Amino acid sequence: MSWLDPSYSLQKPSRGLIRTSQFMIDNWAAAPVNGTVSNLLSVEDDFDLIRLVFGNDTAAVSVVNNVILAPTANPNDGVNPLNGSGAAVAWTQVTFNANGADVLPSATPAGGTVSLTIPAATNANSPVRMFSDWMRVSSLPRSDGGALRLLMVRQFTAVSGTSRMPFAQSVLQPWLIPAVNRGRVVQSYVQFNVDGVSTPANFNSAVPYWFVAPLAVQYYSRTRGATLSVFGDSITAGARSLADRSGWPFLAATSLSSPAHPVQLFNQGWTGQTGANIYANAVATVALSKPDVACFATWTPNDQPATQATADLSWSRAVELAEMARVAGAVPILITPIPYIGLTAAQEAFRLSVVNRALSTAASGSMLVADMNSALTNGAFPARILPQFDSGDGTHPNDAGYAAMAAVVTPVIRQALAL
């Protein structure tokens, strides 16, 4: 059966209810020692089971000390959860009885373990990811007119421990603008020298921050939706777009998501990722992210100099990852490489060879392909990004360029999901 067969996506084994969302992309730092970080986050659908994903990108162990979570019916002050009547919602203690393992709720051991030690990573570009236990917590209907469901997560890092957190200092402020975030709220607050987890009321003089405690969340959705997982470099991340996050994956996912069919985005595009980094990270996280559709970059400008060997390797890795996604129950989509500045004529030929392989594969009916090259190229040789789509560095698109890329990939994702 071809991936182009519309019935394929309806028969995929993964069409279950687990969704995965990642909130920050790219950067990591040490959590504030003896401090509490609290986050207000949104997900696409109602949930009744939820767990947190934590990561470690360093050569030393990382310790998650103590975490609580709670649903909230509205943003309130960003740190104190409320129900629809305006009354306080009790926090739930997050446990790690399964020692970070990826297990179903029924296989989770009983107990009261509230900390997790994450082993050292062998490669900073492929962090170790581990899970909290599944927590039986139900989302709340919004009381403020919002459509998405809101979650608050709070983590305390003790003096004796170390913990790694994703962060984005330049992102969170513009991400507060509704026109930018499209309702996908990410807010962060910190209070130093206080444990606001063991005693939540102690978290009473917080200030805005830029760290997000969990790397990602997974939840059992109530609606037959989808997780869109994407893998690539800074172009996949959306670098040089609004808030550096409004790239084609975000635009595509949010345009396709609806209450009847929520689409949750898991973006693994990172700045500076080489082909080897993209490959290693995808190998580690394709199955973990529980995808329904998985998009893979087939080339990156970070592999320098471009050669026939790098072109062949990039392509072979992409098709291997596509098959890995298929085995995991997802429909794979390959992304053709866009033009960028600095390539010689010979190097441009290598890039175009990957474009042509992807188009040939799509024409044969064996693979879905989103041809981003055709949307952004000026048609020259060597090609460049069309001026109206160039952010100014000759490599990354601007917002109009990312919108053009989203216009290409969105119908392909729609086809994969049979929407």
Predicted regions: what is each one?
Residues 227-237, 263-269, 292-298, 325, ...:
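Structural recognition of the beta-strand scaffold that forms the well-ordered cores
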Residues 4-62, 193-195, 200-220:
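Beta-sheet-rich sandwich/jelly-roll-like modules and their strand-loop junctions
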Residues 7-17, 183-184, 189, 193-269, ...:
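Serine-esterase "nucleophile elbow" of acetyl-processing enzymes
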Residues 73-171:
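Aromatic- and Gly/Pro-enriched, solvent-exposed loop/edge beta-strand patches characteristic
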Residues 339-419:
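Catalytic His-Asp segment of secreted/periplasmic serine-dependent ester chemistry enzymes
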Residues 62-75:
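Short, surface-exposed beta-strand/strand-loop-strand elements in extracellular ectodomains
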Residues 297-303, 321-353:
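Active-site segments of SGNH/GDSL-like serine hydrolases
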Residues 237-240, 248, 275-316, 337-340:
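Oxyanion-hole/transition-state-stabilizing segment in secreted/luminal serine hydrolases
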